[in-house]
C-alpha cells in the first residue's frame, strides 16, 4: 500500500497543459518593440502583448509567457521606426508553433533585427509533447527512479527490472537515430515495466525511433512598411536578410 501511495503521489496524468515560452530579440539599432502572443492562427484568441526596449547589440527577452500546448499559436513582433532608412515599421510573424519543436530560431533573420528566437519549456515536473503528464523528478530520484520523456516512471538509465537492479541488454530495444532504451512503467501500480525507445523529441518517433518526425518548424515572415518610393528603404529591404545571431544559443 505504501508503494502504491508513493507512486500515486509522483505520477499523475491530467488533461491540462502546463508550460511557458521565452522570446529573445536582438538588434543593431535602439528599438521599441511590441511582442504579441496568441492562441490559434486564423482567429487568434487569448492575446498577450508585451513591450520591450532593445539596446543596440544587446539581447532583450520576454519570459514566462503561458502557452496552451497541442494547439497552433502565433507570435507577432512589431518594431518602432528606423528613421535612418525611412522605415516606418517592421513586423516579424511566426505561425503555428508547436511543442514538437521546443526551440525556434531560423538560420537567417530580417533587419533591423539581428537575432530572434523563442523557446518553449514544460513547467517543472510536467512532461510529454504537450506538457500534460505530471511526474515529480525530484521525488522519483529519492526512490531510485526517473521520469521518462513521456512523463511515465521508470528505472534510472541503463537499468530495468522489479527493483531496477538489472542492466539493460545492449540489443534490447534496437533503437535507431540516437534513441535510448529505457524502462517505463505503464501505470502507477505496475511492478515490472517494459523497455521502450526514448526518441529525440521533435526529431524522430516510432517504436524504434525509425521515423522522422513531421517538420513542425514554423516559417518566419517579415513585412517592412516604409516611405513610398524611398531609395534608402529599397536598399534596406534588399539587404535586410542577415544571419540570425541567436540561432545557436543554448535554451534558457
UniProtKB/Swiss-Prot annotation:
Which Pfam family is an annotated match for this chain, by its short name?
Answer: DSL
Disulphide linkage map: 122-131, 135-147, 155-164, 173-181, 175-197, 199-209
Give any single GO term for biological process: Notch signaling pathway
Q: What happens when the gene is disrupted?
A: Causes adjacent vulval precursor cells (VPCs) to adopt altered cell fate; phenotype exacerbated when combined with simultaneous RNAi-mediated knockdown of apx-1 and lag-2, and further worsened on lin-15 mutant background. Severe vulval precursor cell (VPC) fate abnormalities, vulval defects and failure to up-regulate lip-1 expression, on an osm-11 mutant background.
Keywords, ordered alphabetically: Developmental protein, Disulfide bond, EGF-like domain, Notch signaling pathway, Repeat, Secreted, Signal
Question: Residues of the signal sequence?
Answer: 1-17
The UniProt entry's GO CC annotations, sorted and at most eight, read: extracellular region; plasma membrane
- Residue ranges of the EGF-like domain? 169-210
What InterPro entries does the record tag this protein with? DSL, EGF-like_dom, Lag2
Q: What is its main location?
A: secreted
**Can you give the residue ranges of the DSL domain?**
120-164
A single GO molecular-function term is: Notch binding
Its annotated compartments are: Secreted
Described function: Probable secreted Notch ligand involved in the mediation of Notch signaling. Involved in the lin-12/Notch pathway-mediated signaling of cell fate in vulval precursor cells (VPCs), acting redundantly with lag-2, apx-1 and osm-11. May also be involved in glp-1/Notch signaling.
Q: How does it assemble?
A: May interact with lin-12/Notch receptor.
Q: What is this protein called?
A: Delta-like protein dsl-1
Q: Which organism is it from?
A: Caenorhabditis elegans
Q: Which gene encodes it?
A: dsl-1
Amino acid at each position: 500500500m505504501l508503494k502504491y501511495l508513493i507512486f500515486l503521489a509522483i505520477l499523475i496524468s491530467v488533461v491540462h497543459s502546463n508550460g511557458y515560452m521565452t522570446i529573445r530579440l536582438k538588434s543593431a539599432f535602439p528599438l521599441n518593440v511590441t511582442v504579441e502572443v496568441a492562441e490559434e492562427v486564423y482567429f487568434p484568441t487569448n492575446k498577450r502583448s508585451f513591450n520591450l526596449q532593445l539596446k543596440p547589440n544587446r539581447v532583450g527577452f520576454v519570459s514566462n509567457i503561458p502557452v496552451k500546448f497541442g494547439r497552433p499559436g502565433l507570435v507577432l513582433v512589431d518594431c518602432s521606426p528606423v528613421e535612418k532608412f525611412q522605415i516606418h515599421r517592421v513586423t516579424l510573424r511566426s505561425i503555428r508553433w508547436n511543442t514538437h519543436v521546443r526551440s525556434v530560431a531560423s538560420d537567417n533573420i530580417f533587419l533591423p533585427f539581428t537575432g530572434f528566437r523563442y523557446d518553449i519549456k514544460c513547467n517543472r515536473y510536467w512532461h510529454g509533447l504537450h506538457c500534460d503528464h505530471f511526474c515529480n523528478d525530484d521525488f522519483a530520484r529519492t526512490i531510485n527512479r526517473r521520469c521518462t520523456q513521456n512523463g511515465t516512471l521508470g528505472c534510472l538509465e541503463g537499468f530495468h527490472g522489479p527493483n531496477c537492479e538489472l542492466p539493460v541488454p545492449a540489443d534490447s530495444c534496437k533503437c535507431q537515430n540516437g534513441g535510448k532504451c529505457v524502462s517505463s512503467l505503464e501505470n502507477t501500480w505496475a511492478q515490472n515495466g517494459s523497455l521502450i525507445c526514448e526518441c529525440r523529441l521533435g526529431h524522430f518517433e516510432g517504436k524504434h525511433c525509425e521515423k522522422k518526425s513531421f517538420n513542425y518548424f514554423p516559417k518566419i515572415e517579415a513585412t517592412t512598411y516604409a516611405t513610398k518610393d524611398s531609395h534608402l528603404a529599397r536598399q534596406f529591404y534588399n539587404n535586410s536578410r542577415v544571419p540570425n545571431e541567436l540561432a545557436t544559443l543554448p535554451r534558457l
